[in-house]
């Protein structure tokens, strides 16, 4: 016996409504971050090697990412309730310019091992105990940072980058990998990617959107 068309439509509508009600999206920003730093060899004991004015003097109006300079950031995930499945995670990064003109690449990798107070080019932390990176600048593959990049993003102009980080968020949320945040790098020696500073015009612009649903 055939089901009436109206009955089928009602069933489909109820299914769609059920799915939309169960799935939720939260948004975190840099204002929620527990740890953040920009490190580089030009100021090996500083955690804010962001925009060089000249002669080893830096300020925090921009983040100028070059081959030797790295951006570290960690978001807490405790706003995701227990018993969920992460279905989508997108990280938004505000880029203001690239130089020279053309296509550049931004690399995002998971950090390995705890880092914190006093983090800089030489050390992952200086308190409560002084711990050096395995290689300066958190460069140690599989010891300081993941060998494989979580994302490689092509950048050719300013604007918002929308980066799929679903796999990393799922790994951190389930506890399969400890959440130590990301290290963001540029590997081409000729590239400059300038990012808005979370301490200046970019405050609140580093958004992490996570969609999850009950398992």
What are these language model-derived features?
Residues 93-95, 186, 212:
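Short beta-strand segments enriched in hydrophobic/aromatic residues
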Residues 82-86, 170-180:
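Short glycine/proline/serine/threonine-rich loop/turn segments at secondary-structure transition edges
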Residues 7-16:
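Bacterial N-terminal signal peptides
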Residues 1-4:
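Positively charged n-region of N-terminal signal peptides that target proteins for export
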Residues 21-79, 116, 188-189, 199-215:
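Flexible, small-residue-rich N-terminal segments that precede or flank a structured functional core
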Residues 184-193:
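Short beta-strand-plus-loop segments that form exposed binding edges in beta-rich domains
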Residues 98-171:
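Beta-strand-rich interaction/scaffold domains
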Residues 75, 85-97, 208:
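A short beta-strand element within beta-rich, extracytoplasmic domains
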């Amino acid at each position: 016996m055939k089901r009436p068309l109206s009955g089928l439509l009602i069933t489909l509508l109820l299914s769609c409504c059920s799915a939309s009600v169960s799935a939720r999206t939260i948004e975190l920003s840099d204002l929620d971050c527990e740890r953040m730093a920009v490190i580089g060899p030009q100021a090996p004991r500083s955690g804010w090697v962001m925009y060089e004015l000249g002669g080893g003097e830096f300020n925090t109006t921009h983040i100028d990412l070059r081959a030797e300079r790295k951006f570290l950031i960690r978001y807490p995930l405790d706003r995701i309730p227990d018993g969920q499945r992460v279905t989508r995670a997108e990280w938004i990064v505000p880029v203001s310019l690239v130089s020279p003109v053309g296509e550049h690449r931004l690399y995002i990798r998971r950090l390995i091992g705890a880092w914190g107070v006093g983090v800089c080019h030489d050390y992952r932390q200086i308190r409560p105990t002084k711990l050096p990176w395995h290689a300066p600048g958190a460069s140690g593959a599989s010891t300081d940072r993941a060998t494989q990049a979580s994302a490689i993003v092509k950048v050719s102009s300013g604007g918002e980058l929308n980066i799929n980080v679903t796999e990393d968020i799922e790994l951190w949320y389930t506890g399969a990998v400890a959440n130590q945040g990301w290290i963001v790098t540029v590997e081409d020696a000729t590239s400059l990617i300038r990012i808005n500073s979370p301490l200046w015009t970019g405050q609140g612009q580093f958004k992490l959107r996570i969609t999850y649903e009950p398992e």
